[in-house]
């Protein structure tokens, strides 16, 4: 990590749970990557409305399925589970043919179904997530 790279520094701070410092570091940073990281920091501070607005704006600007994914994640964190599930379904339609991206989406859907108390649906999505993860080249 280059010390002058604010996004890399922000992710290092987030790993330590230093979200307010991340926010201070990234305020005013214009790049989409900086705003993705800022949204994450906001969400983990419980500032869901701000994070949602940021990620929805990023989706309008970039069309990135990552932004849609983050909207779903923040909705889930805010306890808006049915809305989160609908967003993850929308994201699934936008995904590239990439096993890791599909695995991540399937995991989110499985986890959200679990939070909704639907264990059978959850298990099906989590098993599909594992299958996709095993097909990816990601070592995790």
Q: Whereabouts are the PLM-identified features?
A:
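Amphipathic alpha-helical segments of tetratricopeptide repeats
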Residues: 30-31, 59-60, 89-93, 128-137
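Residue signature of alpha-solenoid helical repeat architecture, marking inter-repeat boundaries
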Residues: 29, 62, 100, 139-140
């Amino acid at each position: 990590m280059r010390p002058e790279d604010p996004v890399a520094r922000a992710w290092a701070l987030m790993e330590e749970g230093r979200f307010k410092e991340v926010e201070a570091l990234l305020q005013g940073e214009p790049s989409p990557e900086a705003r993705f990281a800022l949204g994450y920091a906001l969400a983990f501070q419980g500032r869901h409305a701000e994070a949602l607005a940021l990620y929805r704006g990023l989706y309008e600007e970039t069309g990135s399925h990552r932004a849609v994914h983050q909207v779903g994640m923040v909705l889930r964190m805010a306890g808006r589970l049915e809305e989160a599930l609908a967003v993850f379904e929308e994201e699934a339609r936008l995904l590239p043919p990439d096993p890791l991206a599909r695995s991540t989406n399937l995991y989110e859907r499985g986890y959200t179904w679990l939070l909704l108390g639907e264990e059978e649906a959850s298990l099906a999505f989590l098993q599909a997530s594992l299958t996709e993860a095993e097909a990816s080249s990601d070592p995790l």
